[in-house]
């Protein structure tokens, strides 16, 4: 009898630990998806604002509430399927192209929630819905006015970035975003405007290295 009780107690202990671990994993996944998560800068497209190998904390509350970002916000979003839109594709639509998401519930969860095999870009919001964006003579014009971009390095000019999206109206429900390192950034100049539902997070603070820890100014 005593041996049976010990076995039952051991099984109960194991089950309690398993349940605790499962609950902790669920909480961690939900927190990462809806609230925030860390990430590492892996490309130079946002230099000098963000440098490679810096650690950032991403605020996902903006996606959770489906709030439109503001001009100057640094965001992350799902990388479009088509890297460069042709002139004929732009005439059809200036919105970035994405493949149809997995129809299988498990595949959709793995891709969208766990973000396994998902590629994301980090860029700065430049144009907002309804605004007329023109890239001309190395400058960016919004509704006919040159925008001030103090975050760019001195001497940086904005060309077409090997793309054709240089004179257009930003469609409703989308944003136009570019990297601060304009010469080394594949961005909305190439693949078009990003739908709000594809925006994953807003960059909030640098968390590493410690000498640059803090909120990122626009």
Predicted regions and their residues:
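Soluble "head" domains of membrane/secretory-pathway proteins
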Residues: 2-15, 34, 48-218
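Aromatic-capped interface at the extracytoplasmic side
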Residues: 30-44
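Hydrophobic membrane-insertion alpha-helices, especially the h-region
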Residues: 16-34
């Amino acid at each position: 009898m005593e041996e049976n009780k010990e076995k039952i107690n051991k099984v109960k202990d194991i089950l309690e630990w398993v349940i605790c671990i499962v609950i902790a994993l669920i909480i961690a996944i939900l927190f990462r998806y809806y609230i925030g998560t860390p990430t590492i800068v892996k490309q130079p497209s946002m230099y000098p604002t963000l440098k490679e190998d810096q650690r950032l904390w991403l605020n996902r509350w903006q996606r959770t509430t489906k709030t439109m970002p503001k001009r100057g916000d640094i965001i992350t979003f799902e990388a479009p399927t088509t890297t460069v839109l042709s002139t004929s594709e732009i005439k059809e639509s200036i919105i970035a192209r994405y493949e149809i998401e997995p129809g299988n519930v498990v595949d959709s969860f793995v891709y969208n929630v766990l973000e396994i095999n998902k590629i994301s870009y980090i860029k700065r919001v430049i144009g907002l819905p309804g605004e007329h964006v023109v890239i001309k003579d190395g400058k960016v014009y919004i509704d006919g006015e040159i925008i001030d971009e103090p975050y760019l390095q001195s001497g940086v000019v904005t060309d077409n970035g090997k793309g054709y999206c240089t004179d257009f109206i930003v469609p409703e429900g989308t944003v136009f975003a570019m990297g601060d390192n304009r010469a080394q950034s594949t961005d909305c100049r190439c693949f078009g405007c990003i739908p709000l539902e594809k925006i994953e997070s807003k960059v909030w603070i640098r968390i590493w290295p410690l000498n640059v820890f803090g909120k990122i100014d626009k």
